[in-house]
Amino acid sequence: FADPKNDIAFKKIFGDENHKEVLISFLNAVLDFQGEQTIVEVELTNPYQVPKIEALKETILDIKVTNQKQEHFIVEMQKKDLGDFAKRSLYYTSKAYVNQLDAGKNYHKLKKVYFIGLLNFTMFEGQSCISRHLILNQETNTQDLDDFEFCFIELQKFSKPLGQLSTLLDKWIYFIKNASSLEMVPKEFTGNSALEQAFDSAQMYNWNREEMDVYDYMHLKAWD
């Protein structure tokens, strides 16, 4: 299997217009959406396309999507700690919020923006691999300004073995962290169509030469 932490593999697995159920399942699991919050439909702002190698220096292979409520979601995989990811996540989230309206338009039309960052390095103190960040009232601890939400998953802090994966989110994190070291789909992942599709998309024998070239380029670039 391809390494989902590789930018092009991540975008192919989670940003494919033809397999939206993968991204929907992942988002619902990460954000713990249930009931009326559950995402049932998404529209990809920047669906998967194989980028040209010569353009990759200027290309950010994130995933941008809106749900049935027109809320915005940004998902980004970051392999290396460049020291600016926190600031960058704030910038992209703010930009997605501002870009919803032209100047002078009705601010009530602004929709919530979620940022999900998957990190192959340690960014925050603490033991948990998942941290959620909101704007809270310091005195009452209430979330009165609720149009921004950030979720960071630090893959290096996730250490559960296959036998201890108890939630769908556990399985998604395990898949992203460990898929490239597996030779077959574990039995713990069978029976879930989104997870099975994710493994199918990661099967490199299904990839064309152009995708393989970009994957290899991104793999080498990660070691620069």
PLM features: residue spans?
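Non-catalytic, well-ordered alpha-helical scaffold segments
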Residues: 7-8, 20-25, 87, 110-113, ...
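Short, charged alpha-helical interaction segments and adjacent helix-coil junctions
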Residues: 73-78, 170, 174-224
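Accessory alpha/beta interaction modules
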Residues: 1-151, 159-161
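Generic structural signal for hydrophobic core residues of well-folded globular domains
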Residues: 13, 17, 30, 156, ...
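Compact structured core domains
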Residues: 145, 152-186
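Short intrinsically disordered coil segments
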Residues: 130-136, 166-172, 218-220
